[in-house]
Curated annotation (Swiss-Prot):
Regions annotated as coiled coil: none
Gene name for this UniProt entry: MDE1
HAMAP family documented for this protein: Salvage_MtnB_euk
GO cellular component, one term: cytoplasm
Name of the protein in its database record: Methylthioribulose-1-phosphate dehydratase
Keyword match Chaperone: no
Length: 270
């Protein structure tokens, strides 16, 4: 059960009134507060307040792992103000063929104001996390802490930090030779070293896909990929796990910036 959202960007009663313009099927679908589309709205407002998805940047995608069809993926559209996003504005994609089942352009014009919605440029990167890691959700933010870390380590291909309590919030992952999948075998320990790959930014988001896929394959223990001078992609087995991982990693990135400025090594020598 999700925690209630206390954000004040959108009037919930107004949102409920607008549902009446939708088909009866969609009205029923979006009444569930735990529906992936509603959770994306909730998290977008939270992330906006954290300064992670400002200026229409960033994005969130959720795979309906708890629904009747876990191949259904809900993706926030491109170029919209994340703190004002509504559940009917999501793109609905079905894996593995990546078939678009529904777009916000199908919604009554009185709700969309005839705005022409575009799929998120992050879509191929989100799909990569689902296909390569069997993720339940993927989060992309433009966190300043993520950007700063990639600038501090301008010539490095990875970020590493150890002996910080918050590391324990992240999963310990291992490749299973029998299943051919990356599986969670527990949680990281205080003394473990967290390593996150860094890939180079590109002029267009979708052009990051090959580099992201390569990083995911080369770093089986990672739950995130940093994009230099851009932000970060974080995924998890469920939307709430992805949220926890994203928050924990951002905490560690912020701490790393402060440690670097203070001349404190990020990886403690034994």
């Amino acid at each position: 059960m999700s925690a209630p959202c206390h954000c004040k960007h959108v009037d919930d009663s107004s949102s409920n009134d607008k549902l009446s313009a939708l088909s009866p099927e969609l009205q029923q679908e979006f009444k569930d507060p735990n529906h992936p589309a509603n959770l994306i709205c909730e998290l977008c407002r939270l992330f906006y307040d954290n300064n992670w998805v400002t200026g229409t940047g960033g994005g969130i995608s959720i795979r309906d792992v708890d629904g009747t069809n876990p191949n259904l993926v809900y993706i926030a559209p491109s170029g919209v103000q994340k703190e004002r996003i509504q559940p009917w504005e999501m793109f609905l994609v079905e894996l593995p063929d990546e078939k678009i089942l529904r777009t916000p352009n199908d919604i009554p014009k009185e709700l969309t104001k005839s705005y022409k919605y575009k799929p998120s440029a992050c879509t191929p990167l989100f799909i990569s996390c689902y296909t390569l890691r069997d993720a339940g959700a993927c989060i992309h933010t433009h966190s300043q802490h993520a950007v700063m870390v990639t600038l501090f380590f301008e010539n490095e291909k990875e970020f590493a930090i150890s002996h910080i309590e918050q590391i324990k919030a992240l999963p310990k992952l291992k490749y299973n030779d029998e299943t051919g999948k990356i599986e969670k075998i527990g949680s990281m320990e205080y003394y473990d070293k967290l390593v996150i790959p860094i890939i180079e930014n590109t002029p267009h988001e979708e052009d990051l896909t090959d580099s992201l896929q390569e990083a995911i394959k080369n770093y089986p223990g990672a739950s995130a990929v940093l994009v230099r001078r851009h932000g970060i992609y974080v995924w998890g087995e469920t939307v709430w796990k992805a949220k926890v991982y994203n928050e924990a990693i951002d905490y560690l990135l912020e701490l790393a910036v402060k440690m670097k400025l203070a001349g404190i090594p990020l990886v403690k020598q034994e």
